[in-house]
């Protein structure tokens, strides 16, 4: 569908505008909530209703928009467009920290490191990677909101970080049960299908000993929350290998343009924490990201030819 749009810049500008509006309204809601309640906002699940777009997806959209803005800033000869792009980049980075989307922040760090490695010599890249890692770690440890989101610092009962993950991160149980299903069903060739995969997951949720947690998992009807695991279970190892070959070709082709590469890396990392093909929105995200990544490569090639 997106490939039929002749001027892909309209897709880029439309996406950036939509993400800006959603994040701006969400930011206002967050600020109002914080000013009225004086509570630690980002760590509370009750604030999800303040997000116009679900936090996980909003964070990903912000990362994608930032990458596209970096491409505009680098390629544009219009000073006004450059300044506007830079201002929006700063705004989106601020919003990333405000909404405290863990996956988006980690993807953003990986994108930044990829850009460093792509453009610098190995020694300089190594030093900058170490520096960025130390700075990011310091921010996580010292910022109360981020420390709560990443390190579960508000939990003073459980002694170890692993125990905190087991308690507070639903993906721990989801991925554990998915692994059990893989061992039991042995979907080595053609898989067991999406319906049976979900059915078996729900049956596993009934085994959770804590009643409140068990009911929450069953009520939410969690899928695998990992696209790669879902493909392996639903379509077998053969299906996963075919998908990974497709992924390999995408990454290989996008090496021609750092921003295209970063778009694809962001998408592939996002698939680790979200099963996007179970949502219509997710399928649109997958298609749109690939179309825009391809467009960035083509536009760069056309620019080189014109030069």
Regions found by a protein language model. Give the residues of each.
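Transmembrane signal-anchor hairpin modules in multi-pass inner-membrane enzymes, especially those
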Residues: 3-9, 13, 72-83, 123-126, ...
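Alpha-helical transmembrane segments of multi-pass inner-membrane proteins
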Residues: 7-40, 51-120, 141, 249, ...
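Active-site-proximal inter-transmembrane loops
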Residues: 37-52, 213-226
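Membrane-interface micro-motifs in multi-pass membrane enzymes
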Residues: 49-64, 102-103, 224-227, 232-236, ...
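Transmembrane alpha-helices of multi-pass inner-membrane enzymes
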Residues: 112, 262-272, 276-307
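A membrane-periplasm/extracellular boundary helix in multi-pass inner-membrane enzymes
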Residues: 119-162, 176, 180-185, 194
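Hydrophobic transmembrane alpha-helices and their immediate junctions
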Residues: 122-126, 233-267
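Long extracytoplasmic/lumenal interhelical loops at the membrane interface
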Residues: 162-176, 188-235
């Amino acid at each position: 569908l997106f490939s039929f749009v002749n001027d892909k810049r309209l897709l880029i500008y439309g996406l950036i505008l939509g993400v800006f509006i959603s994040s701006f309204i969400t930011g206002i809601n967050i600020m109002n909530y914080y000013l009225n309640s004086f509570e630690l906002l980002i760590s509370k699940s009750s604030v999800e209703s303040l997000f116009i777009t679900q936090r996980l997806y909003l964070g990903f959209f912000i990362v994608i928009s930032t990458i596209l803005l970096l491409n505009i800033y680098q390629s544009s000869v219009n000073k006004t467009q450059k300044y506007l792009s830079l201002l929006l980049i700063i705004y989106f980075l601020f919003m990333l920290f405000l909404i405290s989307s863990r996956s988006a922040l980690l993807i953003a760090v990986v994108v930044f490191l990829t850009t460093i490695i792509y453009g610098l010599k190995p020694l300089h890249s190594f030093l900058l990677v170490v520096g960025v890692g130390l700075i990011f770690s310091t921010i996580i440890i010292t910022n109360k909101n981020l420390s709560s989101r990443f390190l579960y610092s508000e939990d003073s009962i459980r002694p170890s970080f692993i125990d905190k993950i087991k308690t507070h991160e639903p993906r721990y149980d989801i991925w554990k049960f998915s692994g059990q299903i893989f061992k039991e069903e042995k979907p080595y060739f053609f898989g067991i299908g999406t319906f049976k995969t979900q059915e078996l997951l729900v049956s596993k949720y009934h085994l959770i000993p804590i009643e409140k947690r068990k009911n929450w998992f069953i009520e939410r009807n969690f899928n695998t929350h990992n696209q790669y695991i879902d493909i392996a279970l639903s379509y077998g190892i053969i299906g996963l290998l075919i998908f990974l070959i497709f992924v390999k070709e995408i990454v290989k082709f996008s090496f021609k343009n750092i921003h295209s590469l970063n778009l694809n890396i962001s998408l592939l990392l996002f698939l680790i924490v979200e099963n996007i093909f179970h949502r219509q929105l997710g399928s649109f995200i997958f298609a749109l990201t690939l179309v825009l990544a391809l467009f960035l490569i083509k536009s760069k090639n056309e620019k080189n030819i014109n030069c």
